[in-house]
């Protein structure tokens, strides 16, 4: 059996050096780790998030706000700002990690959760569909998108959503 670390050794991480990388949701748990990693790889990292959202411990402890190339503060439901920002940056790579991910909050405010998670993702897809430059888009979600069937192990890509 091949271990994932063997795949990592074969991957070409030099692709990110001097590239413009936009992370939407860069101040969250996964986004701040990704931003720090890409900065170490010498990428020019841009970030979009809302300042009213709590910053992750990683974001705070690594002083990401001082190391990132540029941060933008707005809600991903704002299509015009998202479109303008992406067309201004012209990123080589876009990582979409923004979401309202708190399960308890989603039960208390399902409409806002739906708008952020679904409309936000639709906005990024539509903007990228209509740009006139090449970019690479990676949308990252959570295991909460899978049907909760009480599995003891992790989910597989073939599991029901």
Language-model-detected regions and their locations in the chain:
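N-terminal Rossmann-like NAD(P)+-binding domain of SDR-like oxidoreductases, especially those catalyzing
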Residues: 1-161
